Amino acid sequence: MLKRKELARKAVRLIVKKVPKEKESILKVDEFLGTLSTAYRKDKLLRNFFLSPQIDRNAKVKALESLAKKYDVPKEVLEVLEYLIDINAMALIPEIKRLYELELEKLMGMLKGELILAKKPSKKLLEKITKTINDILNRQIEIEVKEDPSLIGGFVFKTQAFVLDTSVKTQLEKLARVGGV
């Protein structure tokens, strides 16, 4: 029997192999896995639904298919997830999501990042920040924008392996630690 991490890696390799190599398809699968992972972690009812041996396999597959339809996920990805249902390994979904993002970085040269600003930026400013981050990291980046008024100004950009924090809040905290305030 494969260890859990090995099984998750194999599932991700299969998904990457089967997904069409178009940016749109790749990102749809990423969004789908993200939604599934978040729901699985936060919703006990959903988690119990997928892990319960008393619930019919077909009911689980139908639930998965209806969610996948909303995200227009290729059927090949569903085949991999159906296999996880068959071996009762849906608990691996959060790990599969994490590993899928790493594969996106390696194979596709794409990076997913989170940009946190004090207020919603203009389109022009967002493009400028994105271009600058693309140039710094030398990668194509898919950015998710979030607001956090506590930052006061500046921004925070996060990926799995990189954090760029230019926020006023952090600068003030650093000053306070040093004793400057």
From Swiss-Prot:
Keywords from UniProt, A to Z, are: ATP synthesis, Cell inner membrane, Cell membrane, CF(1), Hydrogen ion transport, Ion transport, Membrane, Transport
Q: Which InterPro entries match?
A: ATP_synth_OSCP/delta_N_sf, ATPase_OSCP/dsu
**Major localization class:** membrane
Query: What is one GO cellular-component annotation here?
Result: proton-transporting ATP synthase complex
Q: Which domain of life is it from?
A: Bacteria
Report the membrane topology from the UniProt record: Peripheral membrane protein
Compartment(s) of residence: Cell inner membrane
GO BP annotations of the record are:
proton motive force-driven ATP synthesis
Subunit record text: F-type ATPases have 2 components, F(1) - the catalytic core - and F(0) - the membrane proton channel. F(1) has five subunits: alpha(3), beta(3), gamma(1), delta(1), epsilon(1). F(0) has three main subunits: a(1), b(2) and c(10-14). The alpha and beta chains form an alternating ring which encloses part of the gamma chain. F(1) is attached to F(0) by a central stalk formed by the gamma and epsilon chains, while a peripheral stalk is formed by the delta and b chains.
Q: Which family does it belong to?
A: Belongs to the ATPase delta chain family.
The protein's name is ATP synthase subunit delta
Q: Which organism is it from?
A: Aquifex aeolicus (strain VF5)
GN (gene name): atpH
